[in-house]
Amino acid sequence: MSVPKKRMQLPREVVVGSNVLPEVPKLLRSVGVPDGVVAVFSGRTTMKIAGNEVADHLEEAGYQTSPVIVKGSTGDDVKKALEALDEIDADVVAAVGGGKVIDVAKVASYRRGIPFISVPTSASHDGIASPFASIRREGRPYSEPAQAPLAILADIEVIREAPERLIRAGVGDVVSNVTAVKDWRLAHRLRNEPYSEYASSLSLMAARIVMKNAKPIGKLLPEGIKKLVQALISGGVAMSIAGSSRPCSGSEHLFSHALDVIAERPALHGEQCGVGTIIMEYLHGGNWREIRETLETAGAPTTAEDLGVSDEEIIEALCRAHKIRPDRYTILGDKGLTREAAERAAEETGVIQ
């Protein structure tokens, strides 16, 4: 029996540590980019925090740089980024910022056939290393074809200075791997969906590392933040191995996306995924209390009140989550939850009162 061909994109170099921004030129040379024009993608705030410093280090090392300010992660933002790359004639992209900056950079660089390196300024989600990007079109997030970073440079001191809420959102995003893998296994068993034990094991290992280190992460200790960043990178690599977002995205992510559409003021993606994981682990018959305890220890939200959304919005999101991606089979099934089942799950887990 022949084996189908599979292509994986993985980062060639990963540097995680304190005060490592000066190593950007060395990192580029190590992955085969000794010179050329670097488009430095960043937000207005993150450009001041780290983008300008990255550009300075590159200029001192002989590279040419050109700043590209990314305001959001919509289709229009991608279009503007593509126009900027064409004007600059860039050889490589350095994405210095949070999730939106990195998502736009990985899509734009992919479409122009040039490499990009990821320089995260926060640890809020696993897009740091994944080959997928979430781009908003017509008010809704869509997964877009992109590429994994050629290299990653994560400065722990820069990430620690980000708003605490972003760190706690990262905890929620990693912990959600637990139910994502359970959903994937369920789809494999019931729908014969392709499944990778290697990718799922790596994803679960990342979740367990964060669960084990919830206390130092919650206290924003350097070693704790390092563990979180490594776990987020591992999740991204797991997705590259799987060739899909399955190892890190299941029913809890569908719940979060539904909440984005329904809620008047949605919370952060990772925060919502963490709360969604509590409920989905309950539906799977798993140890949802352990999930809740991990999030509480790390200072992450565990209730509707913590998220700043209403009980009704939680229930409505649970009822509509299965419609977000009908092709992605999860514990929610084809028909989703009844209102009664959604209300019971949210109440039993303490997400709503």
UniProtKB/Swiss-Prot annotation:
Substrate binds at D126, D173, H257. Binds 1 zinc ion per subunit. Pathway: Membrane lipid metabolism; glycerophospholipid metabolism. Pfam families: Fe-ADH_2. CDD domains: Gro1PDH (cd08173). It catalyses: sn-glycerol 1-phosphate + NAD(+) = dihydroxyacetone phosphate + NADH + H(+); sn-glycerol 1-phosphate + NADP(+) = dihydroxyacetone phosphate + NADPH + H(+). Its cofactor is Zn(2+). One of its GO terms (molecular function) is glycerol-1-phosphate dehydrogenase (NAD+) activity. Keywords: Cytoplasm, Lipid biosynthesis, Lipid metabolism, Metal-binding, NAD, NADP, Oxidoreductase, Phospholipid biosynthesis, Phospholipid metabolism, Zinc. NAD(+) binds at G99, K100, V101, I102, D103, T121, S122, A123, S124, S130. InterPro entries: G1P_dehydrogenase_arc (IPR023002), G1PDH (IPR032837), Glycerol_DH (IPR016205). Zn(2+) binds at D173, H253, H269. One of its GO terms (cellular component) is cytoplasm. Its EC number is 1.1.1.261. Disulfide bonds: none annotated. GO terms for biological process: glycerophospholipid metabolic process; phospholipid biosynthetic process. It is found in: Cytoplasm. Catalyzes the NAD(P)H-dependent reduction of dihydroxyacetonephosphate (DHAP or glycerone phosphate) to glycerol 1-phosphate (G1P). The G1P thus generated is used as the glycerophosphate backbone of phospholipids in the cellular membranes of Archaea. Belongs to the glycerol-1-phosphate dehydrogenase family. This is Glycerol-1-phosphate dehydrogenase [NAD(P)+]. It comes from Methanopyrus kandleri (strain AV19 / DSM 6324 / JCM 9639 / NBRC 100938). The lineage of its organism: Archaea, Methanobacteriati, Methanobacteriota, Methanomada group, Methanopyri.
